[in-house]
Design a protein with these regions (language model features):
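Active-site-proximal, well-structured secondary-structure segments within enzyme catalytic domains
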Residues: 5-27
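Substrate-binding groove of N-acetylhexosamine-processing glycoside hydrolases
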Residues: 20-293
Length: 293
């Protein structure tokens, strides 16, 4: 099998391909390219795979692709809708359902979001007869979080891709805490899930700010990069981070790798607090007009 991506084609139909797109249409440009590449792979004994986010807009074009082609149908929202999965299934195409562990742009993964997303997508795979589930871990703007935070999400994928029974979030987290981490209290993963909520200034907003100020990229209309960044929010997050650290310390006392886990957690929790302070400082200096990068 060969995956040749073909996703997020933001520049297709613009710049060099603008004139051709005006003549033939953006969707036609896309499907002709994918079809040519897929046919080449089939002729050479391979099974082509591609991400499905572009063809969602014109699912009927799936009928032009080789029958062996596999569509990797991704969606990462906690309340991910099933419309795209249904549309691809109705064409008779072969598809994988691809949820995610929700670590992109985060210092610590959005664990509850990943649980909701993965349970939904695995359910859609069963409902629409997908041939598999591909659980994903991405790092938008650089993979800033430690991969260890993706472990609960990876386990959710292993559980629900094979088991149609929906195990409640808290119950499954207790199981993972005990079996994966050796935490006899059963609370470790539930405490991990609290960390992400304390990021007042997000990594994505920092990157957007840099690109706007230094690279002169335009922001989306109405976008406020410092929404919710204020002294009260930063102080509340700092208090919450200290409380989470204490709870995690208690959970890790019975774990076989206490020191290793606490080193990771200490760096991450302190990092979130520092980054929140950076956001507050940047927001304050932006208001005074004295900040110059």
């Amino acid at each position: 099998r060969v995956l040749f991506r073909s996703d997020e084609t933001f520049c297709l139909g613009k710049y060099k391909s603008k004139k051709l797109a005006e003549e033939r249409g953006v969707h036609r440009l896309y499907i002709d390219y994918v079809k040519e590449l897929a046919q080449f792979l089939v002729e050479n004994g391979k099974i082509p795979m591609f991400w499905g986010d572009i063809i969602w807009n014109s699912p009927e074009l799936m009928k032009e692709l080789p029958e062996s082609m596999i569509c990797l149908n991704w969606g990462y929202a906690p309340e991910q809708r099933e419309d795209e999965t249904r549309a691809i299934a109705q064409t008779g195409a072969v598809q994988y359902l691809c949820p995610g562990v929700c670590g992109w742009n985060q210092w610590a993964n959005l664990i509850e979001n990943s649980y909701k997303n993965i349970t939904r997508m695995c359910g859609y795979a069963a409902k629409y007869h997908g041939i598999g589930v591909l659980n994903t871990d991405w790092g938008d703007f650089g993979h800033v979080n430690d991969p260890a935070f993706s472990v609960p999400g990876m386990i959710y994928g292993a559980v629900f891709s094979w088991n149609g029974e929906k195990i409640p979030f808290a119950e499954l987290n207790r199981m993972i805490s005990r079996i994966e981490y050796g935490d006899t209290t059963g609370n470790y993963v539930s405490h991990l899930a609290e960390i992400c909520g304390q990021s007042v200034f997000q990594w994505r907003e920092a990157v957007m700010y840099y690109e706007n100020r230094c690279l002169k990229h335009e922001l989306e209309e109405g976008e406020d990069l410092f929404r919710g960044v204020d002294q009260a929010g930063v102080d509340a997050a700092a208090d919450a981070l200290r409380d989470i650290y204490k709870k995690l310390l208690e959970s890790t006392q019975a774990m076989p790798e206490t020191k290793k886990q606490m080193q990771l957690l200490s760096v991450t929790l302190q990092g979130i607090g520092i980054w929140n302070a950076v956001g507050l400082l940047t927001e304050s200096m932006e208001k005074t007009g004295s900040f110059d990068m």
